[in-house]
Amino acid sequence: MYGDYRQIWERIVEVIKSELTPTSYNTWLVHIKPLAFAEDTLFLSTPNTFTKNIINGRYINIIYDAASKVTNRFIEIKILSEDEEEYREIKESIERENSSESTLLSTLNPKYTFDTFVVGNSNKLAHAACLAVAQSPAKAYNPLFIYGGVGLGKTHLMHAIGHFINKNHAGYKIMYVTSETFTNELVNSIKDDKNEEFRNKYRNIDVLLIDDIQFIANKERTQEEFFHTFNTLYEANKQIVISSDRPPKEIPTLEERLRSRFEWGLIADIQPPDYETRVAILKKKAQSENLNIPDEVLAYVAEKIQSNIRELEGALIRIVAFATLTKSNIDLELTKHALKDIVSNKTREITVKLIQEEVCKYYNIKLEDFRSRKRTKNIAYPRQIAMYLARELTDLSLPKIGEEFGKDHTTVIHAYEKISNEIKQDESLARQIEELKKRIKGY
């Protein structure tokens, strides 16, 4: 996403040097080497654990700040010492990719493999389908369409497919890309008059793993280009794996010809993990990080954090960081203190503005269009859904809700009754409403 990770680190180093004295930099930070960059995490290495601990204790915030300045966004920093098992695993993974007869045309997170994926009732179909595709590309399910909410493991499974094929199928060209990157590259190819180069890149491969396909909704030129890319690969019997936050029929403004193609193969969903799976995920994470976490702590976290895997693992990292900084043992009391902000913030205040913003994001429309007088279906219908949700999730009066939308109360009544009736008959709409309620409530 940001070019070669070594170049990223070089730019970060320049910023760090401007913040530190030469003595501080040359004593400690000069020993850091860039190891890998995947899924918004920059992996760095140090010669030994002592140096790693000094850097984590004194300089990590400076590194975070410098990384944010260089990339214009937050990226995770993970420092590993060369005597750690995780360092050796990542190093070996990179060497395998570089020496493999297959060609990996994009960076995959070395931690996202089938071995590190925790299987439960909520994801076992998606896991089985992905494993089948990895074992027999273009012979099992083609295309494979995976959908589910944020942080549930879709990207993990796609990277796992890439790693497995790269390791076990010689000669395959494998491409992982987000649909946002696909769109940006298309725009640049048009601007620079390099359309043919762009097409050759995406049509002369054996496996295409494209993440977050819902991003191309409302983008006519991107949909047109992806349609032809899909056809070229499919007709050549190449494997296509697609992920989204919702099933094809629920992606708004997606062209029908693309929607039908996405439904040609297998569609597998991933649901939020149940309690037992959440505990298993936390245990796996603790084990991979060589952390000794009491069972009662894992049980508490699994009970309180129910939304997705990313938040579960984030809570565990927060607990460990809190214990390290305060030089305390990890127990239930410390855990409750470390997570008090996260747990209490789960009941955030619900306003009409919040509802409007979440509905706009979900249906990929602009907030200014949403509040305008436009009556096209792709705007008017989500607006009615937002009115319905405002009536369901707030205590505001009908006139007040209408005022927030620039409408009168009779319009709100009509919208509420319309959506209420349609939910009873349309399972797809009912799922969309439930998903929106979760997003609005913050879990």
Swiss-Prot record:
> Region annotation Domain I, interacts with DnaA modulators: residue ranges?
1-73
Q: What InterPro entries does the entry give?
A: AAA+_ATPase, Chromosome_initiator_DnaA, Chromosome_initiator_DnaA-like, Chromosome_initiator_DnaA_CS, DnaA_C, DnaA_dom, DnaA_N_dom, DnaA_N_sf
Q: How does it assemble?
A: Oligomerizes as a right-handed, spiral filament on DNA at oriC.
Assigned protein family? Belongs to the DnaA family.
Where is the stretch described as Domain II?
73-106
What GO molecular functions are on record for this protein?
ATP binding; ATP hydrolysis activity; DNA replication origin binding; lipid binding
GO biological processes: DNA replication initiation; regulation of DNA replication
Q: What is this protein called?
A: Chromosomal replication initiator protein DnaA
Q: Share the domain note from the entry.
A: Domain I is involved in oligomerization and binding regulators, domain II is flexibile and of varying length in different bacteria, domain III forms the AAA+ region, while domain IV binds dsDNA.
In this chain, the stretch annotated as Domain IV, binds dsDNA covers 324-443
What does this gene product do? Plays an essential role in the initiation and regulation of chromosomal replication. ATP-DnaA binds to the origin of replication (oriC) to initiate formation of the DNA replication initiation complex once per cell cycle. Binds the DnaA box (a 9 base pair repeat at the origin) and separates the double-stranded (ds)DNA. Forms a right-handed helical filament on oriC DNA; dsDNA binds to the exterior of the filament while single-stranded (ss)DNA is stabiized in the filament's interior.
**Where is ATP bound in this sequence?**
151, 153-155
Q: Where in the cell is it found?
A: Cytoplasm
Which GO cellular component terms, listed alphabetically, does the Swiss-Prot or TrEMBL entry include? cytoplasm; plasma membrane
Gene that encodes it: dnaA
**UniProt cross-references to HAMAP family, sorted A to Z:** DnaA_bact
Which keywords does this chain's UniProt record carry? ATP-binding, Cytoplasm, DNA replication, DNA-binding, Lipid-binding, Nucleotide-binding
Q: Where is this region: Domain III, AAA+ region?
A: 107-323
